[in-house]
C-alpha cells in the first residue's frame, strides 16, 4: 500500500509539474502603425510559453502583396508609455521573416528561448528591405504583449 501511494504521488507530481511548464496561448490583436501608410493591416499574434521556449505565430492581412516583412519582439522604450510608440530596442534573435502572398496575407511562425524575450513589451512587424529581414520602416503593425 505504501508503494502504491508513493507511485500515485510521484505520478501526480509529474503530471502537475508538466502542466506548470506549459502556459495557455495568449492572443493579441495587431494595430496599424503610422509607418503602415495606406495599408489596412489587421491580424493576430499568438504567443505560447512551453517550458524554456516561446512559440509565436502571427497572421496578418491587408499588407502589400508579395512583399517581405520582418517581425520581432521589442523591449519597452522611453519615448512613450504606450509600448508600440515607445521606440524600444528590438530583440533581434526573435526575428521572423516572411513574404506576403498575392492577396497581402502573411503568416509567420517561430520560436525563441523564453529568457531572451521575458522582458519584451511589444511585438512589431516591419516592411523588410529584402529576404534578409533588414527593417525598412518603424513598423506597419504592432501589439503590446505581456510575457
What are these regions (language model features)?
Residues 1-8:
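Bacterial N-terminal signal peptides that target proteins for export
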Residues 9-18:
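Bacterial N-terminal signal peptides
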Residues 19-147:
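N-terminal leader/targeting pre-sequences
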